[in-house]
Amino acid sequence: SYVGIEVPNPNTSLVKLRPMLESDAFQQMSSPLAFALGKDVSGQPVVADLVRMPHLLIAGTTGSGKSVCITAITACLIMNNTPQNLRIAMLDPKMVELMRFNGVPHLLGKVETDHDRMQGVLKWALMEMDNRYRLLEDAHARDLVTYNRKQERKKLTTLPRIVLIIDELADLMMTSP
């Protein structure tokens, strides 16, 4: 048996995104929603697939790199997908971290900062999810890949993946009923 104890390292090391994206670990991921998270304790790239984790919560203390992580994930998603294949909705209650993505063609509108409009975006996302479940059911498709494959065979319109990114969810929850 082993016991592992994590000790903060006073000597931080910079993890650059490009080498992560060029790593074998990332290149071997075939998913359009693959993203690089960083390096493990032995310096090996850590990659993940948003398809396998449809809900992701990034938590940590102030200054621990949550927003940097969200930015890296978003950059990976944008670089691996066209705006026709991936649409992103972003909510930023603090009006700070996600504003840099305004103007990116993958966005469904602009980065939303108004609390009332954020409620509208969340309601739209729920309606869109329900609508997509009905479409999948009608097409006898288990997932979006199968649905789109069937649509392509019939030369019909496919659906893009939709990713909703919320920075500072706690702030949004505190100000919304």
Q: What are these model-derived regions, one by one?
A:
Residues Y2-E6, M20-A141, L159-P177:
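P-loop NTPase catalytic phosphate-binding loop
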Residues P10-L17:
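Short, charged/polar, Gly/Pro-enriched secondary-structure boundary elements
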